Curated annotation (Swiss-Prot):
GO terms for cellular component: 9+2 motile cilium; axoneme; ciliary basal body; ciliary pocket collar; ciliary tip; cytoplasm; kinesin complex; microtubule. Keywords: ATP-binding, Cell projection, Cilium, Cilium biogenesis/degradation, Coiled coil, Cytoplasm, Cytoskeleton, Flagellum, Magnesium, Metal-binding, Microtubule, Motor protein, Nucleotide-binding, Transport. PANTHER family: CHROMOSOME-ASSOCIATED KINESIN KIF4A-RELATED. Disruption phenotype: Morpholino knockdown results in aberrant cytoskeletons. Most often the external portions of the caudal and posteriolateral flagella are missing with only cytoplasmic axonemes remaining, but in some cells all four sets of flagella are defective along with missing or reduced median bodies. It is found in: Cell projection, Cilium, Flagellum; Cytoplasm, Cytoskeleton, Flagellum axoneme; Cytoplasm, Cytoskeleton, Flagellum basal body. This is Kinesin-2b. The keyword Metal-binding applies. SMART domains: KISc. SUPFAM superfamilies: P-loop containing nucleoside triphosphate hydrolases.
Amino acid sequence: MSKSKGKGSSDNVMVMVRVRPFNKREEQEGATEIIEMDKTLCTVTLHKPVEKGAGSATSECLPSKKVFTYDAVYPSNSTQVEVFDESVREMIDGCLEGYNATVFAYGQTGSGKTHTMMGQKDNPGMIPLAFQRIFDFIAQAKDDQFLVRASFVEIYNEDLKDLLTGATHLQLKEDPVKGVFIKDLSEHPVSDERHIDKLIQKGNESRAVAATLMNATSSRSHSIFQVVLERMTVIDGRECIRVGKLNLVDLAGSERQEKTGATGDRLKEAAKINLSLTTLGCVISKLVEGSKHIPYRDSKLTRLLQDSLGGNSKTLMVVAVSPASTNYDETMSTLRYADRAKQIKNKPRINEDPKDAQIREMRNYVTKLEAQLAEIMQQANAGSGSEVEDKEAYDGEGNMGAGFTGYTADEMANVQSLRKNLDKTKKKRVKYVEQRKENEEAVSAEELATLEEEQKKLEEQIKESERKAKERQLMAKKIAALIEANKSKMVDKKVLENEERLKDAAIREARNALVAQKKEAERLKKELIEAEQQRKQLEEQCTTALDQAQQLELRLNEYKEQLAERREELHNVEADQAKEREIIRNDYADQIKLCELRQFIVSMFVPEEYQRSIESIASWDEDNQAWHFRTQKSHRGMAGFG
């Protein structure tokens, strides 16, 4: 279990809303704008469009409207950088301090979620900008060490796929320490933005996308890019490790078949997407209601977001909506969900010294390897005892220099002595051979054989010394390579400290300072507006009784309008719930028919006694969604079956 800093204060899910510009299809349909935003007051006003064919009887009544208030709102002319600096950066900074953080995009298909989260190469979205911020921070934290690991997973038709390895049918597991996690999901150490960009590009190429009437590149799956950031800091001589987990989630959009024109596989995908989003909506509702049972396990998406919704995480919901009147129902539904979500209370805490942190283990492993290498180098002493050659033997970056021979000082002296003796023996043998050619009696055959035997022994001794030195060389190279491989997993700040990057980082910091000033100006402006509203209220209190009566009458009319709006909203909610119930009833009826059909087939072809035997050894595995059968040595009831 990781230690938490303090008890962890309550922190509501933050919600920001972004509206995209009109697209060509909406312009061709003659759609009107129904979204009005006040960036200062953080309000979204949704205007109900006047229905076509409405006569003069309704012309006196203004279209109804609904006002929502969120943590931040962004009109269609807002930029990616503006959205990131003002809303998303706070989540990233929390992760850098050791909190879990989640940023997820929510909205109907074609509303701009993927554009906001991913963006384009020349206009990066929240995910690339998040990593830019992470490595800016790492470059500035001079005395801290960092280990950053990334993974990319897709939920397609309720199947988990690793987008970086292609592995499918991954399983969800739950652990008292880790919480909910994906078994066998690959984690990739990353050292800079370019490395992460490659992973994102590789993962996006594997994502399921398809064209619909609403979106030419509609995401047919949910994707989660997860980053684990381990940070080691020395405080008062003690090493402190904090681990932040960042989930960047791009949800597939909710769909209506009559608008998307989905058929075949697209329709099946849409059904799975809508089911998981309905479960997400149900989880949000239950959390707001304070229900004891939260149906996280009803879908893989909600199980993975379990900590993000009501748990140990700072969470930002990025709501994407369309401005067009043709999407009024979907926009209203999206804004309602978002309005509920902002009431969810999380309990984020700093994750200190978790047991599964890898940075200390990796650092200790590197230290151990360096000690082993130093021992080998000290023993070998570069073959000469020279400090200069010893330093040249290993460059500290996994490369062994030419100065490292692999011999110890004693071995080198011994080999040199053996080589001198061998040289003398060879010369003596040549001399003996020449003497025997001139006179066979000058040198006996025994003397020559003894000399040849001595030469062989010397050669074997030299070869044995060379073999040991070679083994020592190979061992040193292997250890040096392991050191470099493990060091490469840690973020190398030298790579992040190039001149161009430092300039860009300085610009981003200046930009952030301007954002802080802008936020302060917006806060003061909001206070002035509220003060003006209070002044007007005081003026109302000082009016004459007649004016007060008129004011009361106006308020009464306003309350009547609000009551009408609430009734209409209630009617819409009931209609939406009725549609959802109808979908669930249809699905349930189909499942019942399928079960009855299977039962009928079984009853026709499998005798009842065999059915009972099969049922007695069968058990259902909820986690793996599969039947398991107990093996028994004998089953009398099954005798002769098949």
